[in-house]
Amino acid sequence: MQEAAGLRPIKMSASLIDSAYERLVEAIATGSLQPGERLTQEKLAARLQVSRQPISHALNRLRAAGLATGAGRRLVVAPIDSRRLGELYQLRAAIDGLAAQLAAEKISAGNLARELSPWIDILTRNRDLEDVAPTLDWIRADVRFHDAIYRLSCNSVLIDTVEPLWPHFRRSMGNALSEQRRRSHTRSEHRTIANAILEGRPKDAENAARYHVESAYSAAVEAGLTIRE
C-alpha cells in the first residue's frame, strides 16, 4: 500500500520531536489525517518508525497549536473552525502585506545583508512553480516562499508573530492546492509579489501580498473544507 503523504518514516535527526510534529502537520494538511480521526500513539509511532515518546510530545504540540483536541488516548484531529480561520487570514493579510512592503523597501535601499541572499534566491525560484507536482510539494514550496518574505522583512517581531499561525494555513491550503486552477493562480500571484519585492516597489508588493492572502482564503473556502461553524 502506498505510504500516506506526510507519514513517511522519520530518519534519525537532531530532534525527533520536531520531525514527528512536522510529519503530523503535513499529514493533516494533505488530508491523510482527517478531522475527527483518532491520533493513537502506537499507530503513529509504527507509521513513522520512532518510539512513542517523540510522538507523545508531538501530539501535545498539535493540541497546543489547536490542530488536535481531546485528552489522553482520546485525542483526535481538530475540526476546522471557519470563524477562527477567517480571523487568522484577516491577520495574515495585514502581516504579509507589511512583510512584503518592508522587504521591498530594504531591497530598494540596498540594505539587505549578504546572509539574506538565500531568501532572495527562493523568491526568484518560486516565481516559476510547476503545476505538475504532489500537493505536499506545493505546500512546502508555498511555505518556503512566504517564509523568505518574512525573513527579508528583517522584523523579528513579525516573524515570531506569524510563524505559530502557519500550521493552520498549511492545513487550509491542502485542498485548494490539489486543484490545478488554484496552482496556476498561486504561481501567478507569487510571481507578482516576488517581482514587486525584487524590483523595490513597496506599495505594489504590499497590495499584491494582501490580494494573495485574500485569494488564498477564498480558495480554501471554495475547496469545501470540513468546518465547524
Q: Residue spans of the language-model regions?
A:
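Short linear motifs at protein or domain termini
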Residues: 1-105, 222-229
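Short alpha-helical transmembrane interface motifs in multi-pass membrane proteins
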Residues: 81-82, 173-176
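Conserved amphipathic alpha-helical segments that form helical-bundle/coiled-coil interaction surfaces
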Residues: 109-174, 187-196, 204-214, 218
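Short helix-capping and inter-helix turn/linker motifs at the boundaries of alpha-helical repeat units
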Residues: 15, 136, 183-184
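Solvent-exposed loop and edge beta-strand segments that line ligand/cofactor-binding
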Residues: 178-182
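Amphipathic, non-transmembrane alpha-helical secondary structure
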Residues: 25, 86, 97, 101, ...
